[in-house]
């Protein structure tokens, strides 16, 4: 399921929200009041990479692949970093296990006088359906059943995205929702207007999502973190839409002005961090994975 929300409010068609506007510079509306809950934005370049990893019962990396085509120097640095990762020994159904998983790696570069310093910004682990085994039963997942009202487009002409951490109740109502991060893509304008644009995007999406509903399988309702997922929203303008789409592809750099990632107090310990820099679509991302990276991997300079 996908959602397409135009500026005047469009029809539901996907669990992605694309809010349409014109322009890519954060311009203030007629009355501008910047709420305090959004802090200063940092300017970075980001890139998403696809790959896979095999982790043994001791938490060591047995093998790994990097599927995204990269400059060989950068690819070599990423492979070296992944090979050195260590994990909390993985457990499945109470037993030590070897785990094979797909992964998304997010790189972030910050400009220095001598160039860009690139770090591993985040890693997400997931297992997509096997297209070669169509007969395999679908894994239980949360299904959105009502996605109204649609978020209103803010009074700023921007391209950007936010991520909301959503916790459902077993009966499918939204129990908690909190914004975790906001990114503006290739945005100009004053810093205060960028902050206000992020605040408006967050406020509008949060207000709408509180009224949404879902079907929650009983199996997930009993599982740690099973009621929680990250819901990305994208606000894409008529100007710059192609650039934003292209820069969201794996292996491409995207310029962002973003808030710091923030977690609500109610976040489940097992929930994966998924921020606005980690996504290029609007799919609901749930928390389930037996892999837990040990400290030191995230934030490591390549």
Model-derived features: positions:
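N-terminal signal peptide c-region/cleavage motif recognized by signal peptidases
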Residues: 18-22
